[in-house]
């Protein structure tokens, strides 16, 4: 039975005294045993956290009681295991970093399109559909016919727009991201650049997967998420991907069979990109993680390693159990 509720939330709102919110918010989360990270800035709040249903409900009630933080946009998904191992509330300059001064979604933003209306919009041949996420996210799943800007960070998105999009040529632009927050800024940026008809998926991919039936969906693949689940499928359950602890790229079970894959050290995506010094450091980190595991201790920075290792052991145990049952059946037949 699924016990962990994962809550992705954000809200753009003027928070001039956001620093004062950090301590009570962190205390509330720790008391409720909520794990994950929330970001606070003068422009609002953003993050993903996880806990019991009661804990997440309590957090939303607490936030709703704070001036300006009521009616926060949030999406819920579920997991059998806690995807975070720490509780953090960080103070930032931006809750999602684009690095462009003066972009304010509270002043100007694109047109929100509900998940139920999204298919009709992106099926319009006059609409250019742009995935605002990073390349490694796009690689494991995106909408049919979406353009991949091939960015490594969201900071690179404005340059992509300057080089590839033209208000005179691209009359209708639709954009999407994981939960909606990056599109708040990307659509605001396009509006500032003179684009007229700019649309974005309200609630992001996660809301679309929640509300649109798989048989009607135009989504292809899985959706990358920034926690130890790595990706979720159309049912918002953990998908088939793990993550390379060296480069953080999502990897498949097939890629883990490659000679280039060394747990905690390298994978087919980064084997030719990491230096000898990095390789030595990763080998030592993996050694320390294994030593800590043998002593039943938590190694700093090993959250992802721990979850991946736990899931790996769980899969192996399931395989052994299935093999034993199969052998038992064969013995009975004989």
UniProtKB/Swiss-Prot annotation:
Lineage top rank: taxon: Bacteria
GO molecular function: oxidoreductase activity, acting on paired donors, with incorporation or reduction of molecular oxygen
Gene Ontology biological-process entries: tRNA modification
Catalysis: reaction(s): uridine(34) in tRNA + AH2 + O2 = 5-hydroxyuridine(34) in tRNA + A + H2O
Disulfide cysteine pairs (residue numbers): none
InterPro entries (UniProt xref): Rhodanese-like_dom, Rhodanese-like_dom_sf, TrhO, TRHO_N
All residue ranges annotated as the Rhodanese domain in the record: 123-217
Active site residues per record: 177
EC number(s) per entry: 1.14.-.-
Protein keywords: Oxidoreductase, tRNA processing
Family, similarity comment: Belongs to the TrhO family.
Described function: Catalyzes oxygen-dependent 5-hydroxyuridine (ho5U) modification at position 34 in tRNAs.
Protein name: tRNA uridine(34) hydroxylase
Gene that this sequence comes from: trhO
């Amino acid at each position: 039975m699924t016990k962990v509720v994962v809550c992705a939330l954000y809200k753009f709102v003027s928070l001039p005294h956001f620093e004062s919110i950090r301590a009570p918010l962190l205390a509330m989360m720790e008391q409720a045993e909520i794990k994950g990270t929330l970001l606070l800035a003068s422009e609002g709040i953003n993050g993903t956290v996880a806990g019991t249903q009661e804990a997440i409900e309590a957090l939303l009630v607490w936030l709703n009681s704070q001036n300006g933080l009521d009616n926060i946009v949030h999406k819920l998904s579920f997991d059998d295991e806690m995807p975070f191992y720490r509780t953090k509330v960080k103070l930032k300059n931006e809750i999602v970093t684009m690095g462009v001064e003066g972009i304010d979604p509270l002043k100007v933003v694109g047109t929100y399109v509900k998940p139920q209306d999204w298919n009709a919009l992106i099926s319009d041949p006059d609409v250019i559909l742009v995935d605002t996420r990073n390349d490694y996210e796009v690689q494991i799943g995106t909408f049919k016919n979406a353009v991949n800007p091939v960015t490594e960070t969201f900071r690179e998105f404005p340059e992509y727009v300057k080089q590839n999009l033209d208000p005179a040529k691209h009359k209708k632009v639709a954009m999407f991201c994981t939960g909606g927050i990056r599109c708040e800024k990307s659509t605001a940026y396009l509006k500032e650049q003179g684009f007229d008809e700019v649309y974005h998926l309200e609630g992001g991919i996660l809301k679309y997967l929640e509300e649109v039936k798989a048989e009607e969906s135009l989504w292809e693949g899985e959706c990358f998420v920034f926690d130890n689940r790595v990706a979720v499928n159309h049912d918002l359950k953990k998908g088939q991907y793990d993550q390379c602890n060296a480069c953080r790229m999502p990897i498949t079970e097939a890629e883990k069979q490659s000679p280039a894959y060394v747990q905690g050290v390298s994978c087919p995506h980064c084997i030719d990109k990491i230096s000898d010094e990095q390789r030595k450091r990763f080998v030592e980190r993996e050694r320390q993680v294994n030593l800590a595991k043998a002593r039943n201790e938590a190694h700093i920075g090993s959250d992802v390693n721990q979850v991946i290792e736990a899931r790996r052991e769980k899969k192996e145990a399931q395989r052994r159990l299935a093999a034993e049952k199969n052998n038992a059946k064969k013995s009975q037949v004989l």
